[in-house]
Amino acid sequence: MTEDIIKERLLFLKPTQFNLENESELHRGHKGNSGGEHFNLYIVSEFFEGKNTMERHRIIYNALESLIPKKIHALSLKTFAPKEL
């Protein structure tokens, strides 16, 4: 499953919190959907300490690059360092 691949690819971040929700059912039949799935990701990692939002998102998108757009059509990210909670 795509969820398992995403989790595996992001293990290097050693997240202390990780919540991945597949919301594809909410988007079935929408115009422009290439068949990939829609995900919301909430992740907390010390790896994000000192990095801004754009840098954090770039790290995640680079790790998942080969899954976009075939397996992942949309990905909403909420990224935090532990000290921000």
Residue ranges and their predicted role:
Residues M1-L85:
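N-terminal, polar/charged subdomain of small-to-medium soluble alpha/beta proteins
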